[in-house]
Regions:
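Helix-loop junctions at membrane interfaces in 12-TM secondary transporters
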Residues: 76-90, 99
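A membrane-interface helix-boundary motif in multi-pass transporters
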Residues: 140-166
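Helix-to-loop junctions at the C-terminal end of transmembrane segments
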Residues: 45-59, 142
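Loop-to-transmembrane helix entry/capping segments in MFS-fold secondary transporters
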Residues: 28-29, 111-125, 152-155
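Intracellular juxtamembrane helix-capping segments at the cytosolic ends
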Residues: 98-112
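Short amphipathic helix-loop junctions that connect adjacent transmembrane helices
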Residues: 14-31
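Multi-pass alpha-helical transporter architecture, strongest
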Residues: 160-182
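Structural signature of the two symmetry-related core transmembrane helices
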Residues: 61-76
Length: 182
């Protein structure tokens, strides 16, 4: 689940500039503004909202809520045609960030104190694998579906592909005990 979710959510770093240029004809300045808005929202969610969310809902529900926000954002971004709406939706999309710290908390609790370094090493390794797989996969999907001569022109396809991965994670997490799932 951790690897699938990380691959799915790494789409933003992998294709955001390419996608927003293709879909909305954004300038580098507009891309920078959108990334700044996301960064601020990301910091607020991680710095202010994660702890109360986990306290109120627990780790599993927080993960599920984060997955739901992430899935909804990706599907919406796939079909958007107005860049102004995308900017407005960034704060809601950033709520998907709730899942990652809750997943890491579950990972940490799944092993004893003497294995904390090992589990964090595994998580870091999976993150690194995702950062190799995602750019190759998502830029290829974007290239195929952004070719104006292709049968199907749909630059939002990488977001639908990522949404499918998040949906799979949601299905797995909602049906199993967390320690054996991650």
């Amino acid at each position: 689940v951790f690897l699938l979710f990380t691959i799915g959510t790494s789409i933003y770093a992998a294709i955001w500039p390419f996608f927003t240029v293709e879909r909305f004809s954004w300038s580098p300045g507009m891309i920078g503004i959108s990334l700044t808005i996301y960064g601020v929202c990301f910091a607020i969610v991680q710095g202010v909202l994660v702890r109360p969310a986990i306290k109120i809902w627990g780790e599993k529900k927080t993960i599920i809520i984060g997955f739901c926000f992430e899935f909804s954002a990706m599907v919406t971004f796939a079909f958007l045609t107005d860049g102004k709406i995308l900017i407005i939706l960034i704060p809601l999309a950033s709520l998907g960030v709730l899942a990652q710290p809750a997943i890491q908390a579950i990972l940490s609790k799944s092993v004893g104190d003497d294995r904390q370094g090992a589990i964090q090493g595994v998580a870091s390794s999976l993150n690194a694998i995702a950062m190799v797989i995602t750019p190759i996969t998502m830029t290829w999907i974007l290239a195929v579906f952004s070719d104006k001569t292709a049968k199907y022109y749909f630059p939002g396809m990488p977001f639908l592909f990522s949404a499918l991965m998040v949906l799979l994670c949601l299905f797995i997490i909602s049906r199993r005990k967390l320690a054996s799932t991650l």
